[in-house]
């Protein structure tokens, strides 16, 4: 009964915090009432969604190699004979009908949207799989992962909205490439990129209180790790739990390097960059790892002086590694491999994410008082202080006694609270507000 009561209280807190003010007052729509369809905005000429390069982890992912009729991978391409789609097929070989299953699924969904948007008009494909080398090197057309589309009436005034419909249909990258067509592409079948989530690799290291470092995979409730408050002051914060943890999974990580430091994190995870104001001072801005570019300034930590320094990014690369861990601290930040990062992913507003997790932090604090556990530190660890350096701050309601609401031993996978927030986010937020790789999936 107590567990059920706690769950209901948490759910109430979540709804209170994540519901925009416009939905929290006034007549609004009641529970169970029909949702009003959201207004769709046409793409502008040369606009692409998401706003990253096509072959990056945040969009359709890496080029994996040209597929020919003699390739082993050719059998993975499937013909699309949907009668609601017109295929130009100027080569008269049927090549434009061949595509990956993911591309086919998105195209079929788009065909329905087109007929609903413009009765009597069909979706038209001008380019699909390319076996003749008509596109640029490493084009996804060579893998059957890209299509160029128009409407059957070739009314160019419709193409901006056609692009928007393609985004809504689930294409991983949509580009209003030419006034003559819209370009769309998808991730590779069963690609690692499609399941990246928001984490750090198992071997990433954090700095613990009283000196020394620890692999992120070895963190336990009661540990205090180097973190930062909202003003950029370094301090040691309570480790609460893992938002996500998978020991043996292989994932692609962005490797962001400065002249002396290197941090690895998945595409949808947030990193802090320095943003210069008009008066010359710098402020923190949270940015998806997939959007970090050479020349950006990120923050590195000096544990001896307990200060942060803005340092230029020299190189951004991709690397596959084993294990995926997303630690949550009381302050919502963590210094990983001596680089300051957010504990959050999916949405590019660190402050919103930290607020959304407030009910969980409160519930964990309450749980520590109701079910106190032995305060002695685990074997091999030095004792921790009873309070944080900034214990007067609201975010420090938690103490080193904290435990997960479910269990001291957290199961692998994404925490139920994170899954719940993600689901609520998909209901309340525009699809462009969430990173396309923000929540790991079990299928691509």
Curated annotation (Swiss-Prot):
Chain span(s) of sequence motif Cardin-Weintraub: 33-39
InterPro entries listed in its UniProt record: Hedgehog, Hedgehog_Hint, Hedgehog_sig/DD-Pept_Zn-bd_sf, Hedgehog_Signaling, Hedgehog_signalling_dom, Hint_dom_C, Hint_dom_N, Hint_dom_sf
GO cellular component: endoplasmic reticulum; endoplasmic reticulum membrane; extracellular space; Golgi apparatus; Golgi membrane; plasma membrane
Annotated site location: Involved in cholesterol transfer: 244
GO MF term (any one): cholesterol-protein transferase activity
Stretch forming the signal peptide: 1-24
CDD domains: Hint (cd00081)
Stored SMART domains: HintC, HintN
UniProt KW keywords: Autocatalytic cleavage, Calcium, Cell membrane, Developmental protein, Endoplasmic reticulum, Golgi apparatus, Hydrolase, Lipoprotein, Membrane, Metal-binding, Palmitate, Protease, Repeat, Signal, Transferase, Zinc
Tissue: Strongly expressed in notochord and neural floor plate during embryogenesis. In tadpole, high expression is observed in pancreas/stomach, moderate expression in tail, and low expression in intestine, brain, and hind limb.
Binding site for Zn(2+): 141, 148, 183
Sequence repeats: 386-393, 394-401, 403-409
UniProt-annotated site: Cleavage, residues: 198-199
Entries under Pfam families matching the protein: HH_signal, Hint
Induction behaviour: By thyroid hormone.
Binding residue positions for Ca(2+) 1: 90-91, 96, 126-127
Binding-site positions, Ca(2+) 2: 91, 127, 130, 132
Lipidated sites in chain (N-palmitoyl cysteine): 25
The protein's Enzyme Commission number: 3.1.-.-
An individual GO BP term: central nervous system development
Site (Involved in auto-cleavage): 266
Record-annotated site: Essential for auto-cleavage: 269
Top EC class, one word: hydrolase
Family of the protein in this entry: Belongs to the hedgehog family.
Assembly and binders: Interacts with HHATL/GUP1 which negatively regulates HHAT-mediated palmitoylation of the SHH N-terminus. Interacts with BOC and CDON. Interacts with HHIP. Interacts with DISP1 via its cholesterol anchor. Interacts with SCUBE2.
Stated name of the protein: Sonic hedgehog protein
Highest classification ranks of the organism: Eukaryota, Metazoa, Chordata, Craniata, Vertebrata
Gene for this chain: shh
